[in-house]
């Protein structure tokens, strides 16, 4: 799970930057244009580059998102500066690491940092560490530095660590193995799991964009089978979703059940209809069906987010922009309850951007009822400060209260209620 994210000189964030420490559920609130989506985009950029395996040239445009160029993302277009994106991801229960010489702790944190520069250039670094010491450090400057660059184990077996120029994959290993044994295989497996910590975190992360849903009656059937499509391309995502619903009735059934919990939609089911080389996603009630294109727009918008939540791996980050889109307040509150279920029962890390007081209040209610612990819910308020944006974590107490209140988030309701009361006594 993602332990922390730091972003500097990226879009609205200046050199001071922001640091987010996600919990089981993390809520980002703030006015329009305060940088909430930029936090997701920073992570998507890392995911995009770690998966495309380009060496030496950072990709700002790809399957995840299209941001233009370095000049489009550097704060205030100050191209002499560098963007910094850094993530901390914990690893745990890798006991064979302690058989290495020098020893590496079985539990620790993998810190990865990338610095973006003009001309699609970048440098990256990483450390494997715990609270007491650093076990491995990789720095890429004019000449890569790896400390230590070699580990031994068993009798004569060695691992050489080398720095790479692949974004998101800062190091690789070369193995010299003297003998084959079960213990050696277990040691190598733990080493590979350690070195893949960042790649696994990024590759399993799911991002549900604000622009989503089915905008056609039917979609072309994939010739090579259904596959999920990440990224912010609404057409590609909706086509992939339509195919996934058709080929994976188990996923369609679970998504349908979750939607019923949110909307109170009775015994309706998520299914599909095939016509030639086209597939039409539908909601069914008995023998009757309605294409999702013609369904309630809130339902249309809800399905992509719910598919991301259902199909994500345990421990994966699922980041959803504006999950409340077109939903009734009661449905928004019920949706917050499903977020709690995914976080607690399926151990998925849920992160939201939202303007919905109903979602936030429902999550705070989960803390008040002891369903969530205060540390399970992280609430960050993003706000403008001149030409930059800041992020402030709002403390949640055991009663589900935000210490200091939520005036900035709730002030419109407060003002309008005040106006209503005042008008009553004119």
Task: Please provide the spans of the model-predicted regions.
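Pre-Walker A-like glycine/lysine-rich segment at the N-terminus of P-loop NTPase domains
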Residues: 1-51, 55-73
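Phosphate-coordinating catalytic segments in nucleotide- and nucleic-acid-processing enzymes
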Residues: 4, 50-302, 313, 397-426
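Helical "lid/switch" subdomain of P-loop NTPase nucleotide-binding domains
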Residues: 9, 17-18, 331, 356-359
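Phosphate-binding P-loop
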Residues: 17-23, 309-314, 342-345
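Walker A/P-loop NTP-binding motif
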Residues: 43-49, 308-312, 340-342
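C-terminal lobe/lid and adjacent interdomain/linker elements of RecA-like ASCE P-loop ATPase modules
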Residues: 74-77, 333-426
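Walker B catalytic motif
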Residues: 320-323
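ABC ATPase nucleotide-binding domain "signature" loop
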Residues: 325-329
């Amino acid at each position: 799970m993602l332990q922390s994210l730091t972003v500097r000189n990226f879009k609205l964030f200046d050199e001071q930057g922001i640091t987010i420490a996600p919990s089981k559920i993390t809520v980002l609130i703030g006015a329009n244009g305060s940088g909430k989506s930029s936090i997701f985009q920073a992570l998507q950029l890392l995911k995009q580059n770690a998966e495309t395996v380009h060496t030496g040239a950072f990709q700002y445009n790809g399957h995840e998102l299209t941001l233009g160029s370095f000049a489009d993302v550097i704060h205030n277009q100050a191209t002499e500066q560098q963007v910094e994106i850094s993530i901390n991801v914990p690893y745990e229960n890798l006991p064979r690491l302690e058989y290495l010489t020098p020893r590496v702790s079985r539990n620790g944190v993998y810190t990865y940092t990338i610095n973006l520069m003009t001309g699609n250039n970048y440098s990256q670094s990483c450390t494997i560490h715990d609270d007491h010491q650093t076990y491995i450090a990789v720095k890429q400057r004019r000449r890569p530095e790896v400390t230590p660059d070699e580990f031994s184990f068993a009798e004569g077996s060695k691992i050489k660590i080398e720095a790479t120029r692949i974004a998101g994959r800062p190091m690789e290993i070369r193995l010299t193995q003297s003998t084959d044994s079960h213990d050696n295989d277990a040691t190598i497996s733990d080493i590979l799991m350690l070195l893949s910590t960042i790649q696994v975190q990024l590759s399993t992360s799911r991002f549900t964009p604000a622009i989503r849903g089915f905008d056609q009656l039917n979609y072309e059937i994939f010739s090579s089978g259904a596959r999920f499509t990440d990224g912010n391309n609404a057409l590609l995502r909706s086509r992939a979703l339509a195919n996934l619903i058709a080929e994976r009735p188990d996923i369609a059934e679970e998504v349908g059940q979750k939607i019923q919990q949110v909307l109170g939609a009775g015994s309706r089911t998520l299914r599909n209809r095939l016509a030639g080389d086209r597939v039409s996603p539908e909601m069914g009630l008995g023998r009757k069906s309605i294409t999702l294109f013609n369904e309630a727009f809130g339902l249309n918008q809800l399905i992509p987010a719910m598919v991301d939540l259902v199909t994500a791996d345990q421990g994966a980050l699922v980041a959803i922009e504006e999950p409340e889109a077109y939903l009734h307040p009661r449905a928004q509150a019920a949706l917050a309850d499903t977020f709690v279920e995914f976080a607690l029962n399926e151990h998925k890390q849920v992160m939201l951007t939202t303007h919905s007081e109903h979602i936030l209040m429902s999550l705070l209610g989960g803390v008040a009822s002891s369903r969530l612990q205060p540390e399970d819910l992280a609430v960050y308020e993003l706000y403008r400060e001149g030409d930059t944006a800041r992020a402030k974590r709002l403390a949640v107490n055991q009663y589900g209260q935000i210490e200091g209140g939520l005036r900035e988030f709730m002030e419109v309701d407060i003002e309008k209620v005040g106006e209503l009361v005042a008008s009553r006594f004119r």
